[in-house]
From Swiss-Prot:
<keyword id="KW-0145">Chemotaxis</keyword>
<keyword id="KW-0963">Cytoplasm</keyword>
<dbReference type="InterPro" id="IPR035909">
    <property type="entry name" value="CheB_C"/>
</dbReference>
<dbReference type="InterPro" id="IPR000673">
    <property type="entry name" value="Sig_transdc_resp-reg_Me-estase"/>
</dbReference>
<feature type="active site">
    <location>
        <position position="181"/>
    </location>
</feature>
<protein>
    <recommendedName>
        <fullName>Protein-glutamate methylesterase/protein-glutamine glutaminase 1</fullName>
        <ecNumber>3.1.1.61</ecNumber>
        <ecNumber>3.5.1.44</ecNumber>
    </recommendedName>
</protein>
<keyword id="KW-0597">Phosphoprotein</keyword>
<dbReference type="GO" id="GO:0006935">
    <property type="term" value="P:chemotaxis"/>
</dbReference>
<dbReference type="GO" id="GO:0005737">
    <property type="term" value="C:cytoplasm"/>
</dbReference>
<dbReference type="InterPro" id="IPR001789">
    <property type="entry name" value="Sig_transdc_resp-reg_receiver"/>
</dbReference>
<feature type="domain" description="CheB-type methylesterase">
    <location>
        <begin position="169"/>
        <end position="354"/>
    </location>
</feature>
<dbReference type="InterPro" id="IPR011006">
    <property type="entry name" value="CheY-like_superfamily"/>
</dbReference>
<feature type="active site">
    <location>
        <position position="207"/>
    </location>
</feature>
<dbReference type="Pfam" id="PF01339">
    <property type="entry name" value="CheB_methylest"/>
</dbReference>
<dbReference type="GO" id="GO:0008984">
    <property type="term" value="F:protein-glutamate methylesterase activity"/>
</dbReference>
<keyword id="KW-0378">Hydrolase</keyword>
<dbReference type="InterPro" id="IPR008248">
    <property type="entry name" value="CheB-like"/>
</dbReference>
Length: 359
């Protein structure tokens, strides 16, 4: 069964390229391309789409206002098509908090070439969005070429060696590692504000484009009792601090004596992502072993499944979010299937469990 899509963007170039690109996928039907939300609402009265690709800054009605109307009337998976600017990042994060499920970034210049180059990724974003459970999104917010073999999926081996079993854990200080993707921004905005300032240091990988993670960390910092910031190499992971992996970079945790410190580095995509949950989890397995708590939450794909198994084998406590509270039960399901999960919990229970751990 095909996925029906409505494109809403005031750029004629973006509308044209997205329409051509998505129409070329045999399982996607483009219902139309509207220059603003007013035209879009007229089209949606005729037939409601399965997925909406939505620009933010448009005439007559901005995308954020339109998104909120959609979520009030009939919650629908929305992919935000946002510019790579600081202002665009802030507004896009507001859109994710309001219920959007994913972000597509577009440059200010050469948009046609950029979108054509990213065709496979964008088509897959639409397919993934169609699987999102919008009832869960709303609840959390309120409290051929496309079928060609995928690009080689690298493992965390390309960034750091697997745990040897010979590591020395020279401290009893605890650390929390969290990995998430689709639906994760809403889940993190629910979970992290529940943590007290006395909780262990937290390292987070949220699949998100570069230039967005700094704004996301700032947003979380305003909501939380713990200090939240985008990770930089050398940052200490201490009690009451949460570090967010920068978009486009891998986040590792290493030891500096008895302390945990962040190591932010370039590298190839791992499990098709950068930052990769597998990389973070492996690094925590190596440096913290049984002193770590690993949490894998809502998201598409299998990033983190192998790393969580490595954390489990190193003695860490490992937790997966349950299907009912996930927007997409992909990453947690894969982690469970890999045998690396000790406990399966709702998002609410995960927050309660982590809030009870002291650094």
């Amino acid at each position: 069964m095909s996925v029906s899509v409505l494109i809403v963007d005031d750029s004629a170039v973006v509308r044209e390229v997205l329409s051509q690109m998505l129409s070329s996928a045999p399982d996607i039907e483009v219902l139309g391309a509207a220059p603003d939300p007013i035209f879009a609402m007229t089209r949606m009265k005729q037939r409601w789409p399965d997925v909406i690709v939505l620009d933010i800054e448009m005439p007559r009605m901005d995308g954020l206002t339109f998104l909120r109307k959609i979520m009030d009337e009939r919650p629908t998976p929305v992919i935000i098509c946002s510019s790579l600017t600081e202002k665009g990042a802030r507004i896009t994060l507001d859109a994710l908090a309001a219920g959007a499920v994913a972000i597509i970034t577009k440059p200010a210049l050469n948009q046609r070439a950029f979108l054509l180059e990213a065709a496979k990724e964008l088509v897959q974003e639409v397919r993934d969005a169609a699987r999102a459970k919008m009832g869960v999104v709303k609840r959390i917010s309120q409290g051929a070429a496309e079928h060609a073999p995928p690009a080689p999926k690298l493992t965390a081996d390309v960034v750091l060696e697997a745990p040897s079993g010979l590591e020395k854990y020279r401290t009893t200080e605890k650390i929390i590692a969290i990995g998430t993707s689709t639906g994760g921004t809403q889940a993190l905005e629910y979970l992290l504000p529940k943590l007290p300032a006395t909780c262990p240091g937290v390292a987070v990988v949220q699949h998100m484009p570069e230039k967005f993670t700094a704004s996301f960390a700032e947003r979380l910092n305003r909501l939380c009792r713990v200090e939240v910031k985008e990770a930089q190499t050398g940052d200490r992971l201490i009690s009451g601090v949460a570090l967010i992996a920068p978009g486009g970079k891998h986040l590792l945790v290493k030891r500096n004596g008895a302390q945990y410190v962040a190591d932010v580095k370039d590298g190839p995509l791992v499990s098709r992502h950068r930052p990769s949950v597998d990389v973070l989890f492996r690094s925590v397995a190596v440096c913290a072993g049984g002193n770590a708590i690993g949490v894998i939450m809502t998201g598409m794909g299998d990033d983190g499944a192998r790393g969580m198994r490595e954390m489990h084998d190193a003695g860490a406590r490992t937790v997966a979010q349950d299907e009912e509270s996930c927007v997409v039960f992909g990453m947690p399901a894969e982690a469970i299937n890999h045998g690396g999960v000790d406990e399966v919990m709702s998002l609410e229970r995960i927050a309660h469990m982590l809030a009870g751990i002291r650094g």
